[in-house]
Amino acid sequence: MLDPIVKTIEVPCSQEKAFNVFVNEMDSWWPLGKFTVSAMGGAPAKAIRVDAKQGGKIVEIGPSGTEYLWGTIKSYDPHDFFSMDFHFAPPGEKVDARTLVEVRFTALGNKRTRVVLTQSNWEAFGEKAAMLRDRGYGQAWVAIFEGAYKAACGG
């Protein structure tokens, strides 16, 4: 069993804002020109659409309007917790497995929040699991979560 990726940051904003930025403003901070299906195909994505509710979909909108399903929201507890099944593959490759991404938001005061992102279920990828975890997502979350998301929260 492969250990999950766990990333912990503190952001200088309220718990409510930290949650809303992560879920409802995702396409304002996610690096659309680097960490998207479209970017793997050579062009930045236009947008990310999040249907913010349990069972809602997270969808990338490509430059030509093509939609790529990133995952489905499994748990949705506004301001506290958000989880989704998650994976996207290069253009033309079938997505046959998904990880579980869980994000927990804990208030540390009026203007400070701890945000913990955990990505698990690597076993679903079989032989590719360690490579995806260590060289793919493990490195990407540094730029996406610790960099872009934290900056969007004012950090």
What are these regions (language model features)?
Residues 120-155:
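A conserved amphipathic terminal alpha-helix motif
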Residues 49, 54, 59-112, 120:
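Hydrophobic-ligand binding "helix-grip"
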Residues 39-46, 150-155:
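Short, highly charged C-terminal tails/helix-capping segments
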Residues 34, 107, 116, 145-152:
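Short, contiguous alpha-helical
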Residues 6, 45, 101, 132-136:
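Alpha-helical scaffold segments that form or flank carboxylate-/histidine-based iron centers
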Residues 16, 80, 147:
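Glycine-centered loop/turn positions within well-structured domains
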Residues 1-44:
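Hydrophobic ligand-binding cavity/cleft-lining segments
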Residues 18-22, 58, 73, 84, ...:
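Hydrophobic pocket/interface hotspot
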